Amino acid sequence: MSRVAKKPISIPKGVEVSVQSDMLTVKGVKGVLTFPKSDNVNVVMDGDILTLSANDHSHVSLAGTVRAILSNMIKGVSIGFERKLELVGVGYRASMQGKDLNLSLGFSHPLLFVPPEGINLLTPSQTEVVVQGIDKQRVGEVAAKIRNFRPPEPYKGKGLKYATEAIMRKEAKKA
């Protein structure tokens, strides 16, 4: 069996997991997440511990994937996820207009980004954007969409980058 799927998931206090025949539901302080359950993966709840196993050898990797997704769902409804973006460049600014994000990224017009349902955007400063939510995949997708408005370029490093991202710099052309 998969090493990932072998590891049991402990459910923290304040989180409720329900396993139906076709759906997994996780309820917590921050919200509710659901995931369609495959017939090829067995999910057994024993008190506050979840264990997963594959029905046959060909679905071992699926059991590992479902275990990782379930673990992220439990973490999301209890703690939440966030991605931080930094704006690097002269005149690059971010501000909030209600729930929408207004970006000035050197274009002739400002960009207005409307976040999807379940995603919160914050701007602690004019050069920082924080994407928060309970669904890890959606938080990453929204952060990637915002970053793609002006990805960092390798010569000066200008653009929108993740806070943990290191930009590989190139040397300018020599005359």
Swiss-Prot record:
Signal sequence bounds: none
Record GO cellular component, one term: cytosolic large ribosomal subunit
Keywords: Ribonucleoprotein, Ribosomal protein, RNA-binding, rRNA-binding
Molecular function via GO: rRNA binding; structural constituent of ribosome
Cross-referenced Gene3D superfamilies: Ribosomal protein L6, alpha-beta domain
Taxonomic superkingdom: Bacteria
Pfam families, A to Z: Ribosomal_L6
GO biological process terms held by the UniProt record: cytoplasmic translation
Keyword Ribonucleoprotein belongs to the record: yes
PROSITE patterns the record matches: RIBOSOMAL_L6_1
Keyword check for Ribosomal protein: yes
Subunit structure: Part of the 50S ribosomal subunit.
Similarity annotation: Belongs to the universal ribosomal protein uL6 family.
UniProt function note: This protein binds to the 23S rRNA, and is important in its secondary structure. It is located near the subunit interface in the base of the L7/L12 stalk, and near the tRNA binding site of the peptidyltransferase center.
Protein name: Large ribosomal subunit protein uL6
Organism expressing this protein natively: Xylella fastidiosa (strain Temecula1 / ATCC 700964)
Lineage, broadest ranks: Bacteria, Pseudomonadati, Pseudomonadota, Gammaproteobacteria, Lysobacterales
